[in-house]
Amino acid sequence: MSKETKKPFRQSVAEWRQFVYNPNSGEFLGRTAKSWGLILLFYLVFYGFLAALFTFTMWVMLQTLSNDIPKYRDRISSPGLMISPKPDTALEFYFNKSDAQSYAEYVSTLRKFLETYDDSKQSQNINCTPGKVFDQNDVAVKKACRFNLSELGQCSGKEDKTFGYSKGTPCVLVKMNRIIGLKPEGEPYIQCTSKEPGAVEINYFPSGGLIDLMYFPYYGKTLHAHYLQPLVAVQLAINSNSTNEEIAIECKILGSPNLKNEDDRDKFLGRIAFKVEMTE
């Protein structure tokens, strides 16, 4: 079998140059200017059509959505619970009541959080009727109910600037996550329990941990711009015999049949658990 004759290097270079540009036929990379123009025109029209189709499809979809209210809201039927301050160490509070530096971050977080609830920031909010859902479906601009810091009692930061941390009675603020259109039934309230009986005495502000219905429903950030979530302050009076011990606390929403507090797939649905350890 004869071997193929290898082309000289100069011949290969000449053929490559001719392929890139053929001066006899005026072809560039094997195509004339007309051929290149037709190909570019085809792809311009083709991809332009795809872009226009995509844009039109997105425009049609956006026409079905509201800027104010999510279209689908059935996946989240019950709110979760959140607390403030929120420790960096996985919802575990560690502090020394004799060392201001150990709880300084907690106090700072609470002060900053409550700034939005200051009377000066609620000038556009109104006094609502307690115990009654505040429906505003027929009003374009929704009014927000005033939340008075005095409702938080000893945890308001007015009388005790350390929110009880310097006295061994730390305060934790509990709130429900916002859900547009949610109308709690019954008389919802927050109840916290300790897994170590007798380790801590729990006090609530407002009394009984009540969450007033007048703060519902919520209409969304756009329509309800000045809305403030109702808060429940939980004050933990730690027993002197329980210092240097880790105390597990769990808070739940109770008193409302349409607010869930048990779900194995979502540990924050209607409840929240945290730990507190105080030293002296």
UniProtKB/Swiss-Prot annotation:
Predominantly expressed in brain. InterPro entries: Na/K_ATPase_sub_beta (IPR000402), Na/K_ATPase_sub_beta_sf (IPR038702). Belongs to the X(+)/potassium ATPases subunit beta family. GO terms for molecular function: ATPase activator activity. This is Sodium/potassium-transporting ATPase subunit beta-3. The chain crosses the membrane at residues 38-62. This is the non-catalytic component of the active enzyme, which catalyzes the hydrolysis of ATP coupled with the exchange of Na(+) and K(+) ions across the plasma membrane. The exact function of the beta-3 subunit is not known. One of its GO terms (biological process) is intracellular sodium ion homeostasis. Signal peptide: none annotated. Keywords: Cell membrane, Disulfide bond, Glycoprotein, Ion transport, Membrane, Potassium, Potassium transport, Signal-anchor, Sodium, Sodium transport, Sodium/potassium transport, Transmembrane, Transmembrane helix, Transport. It comes from the Eukaryota. Residues 1-37 are cytoplasmic. Pfam families: Na_K-ATPase. Disulfide bonds join 128-145, 155-171, 192-251. It comes from Gallus gallus (Chicken). It is found in: Cell membrane.
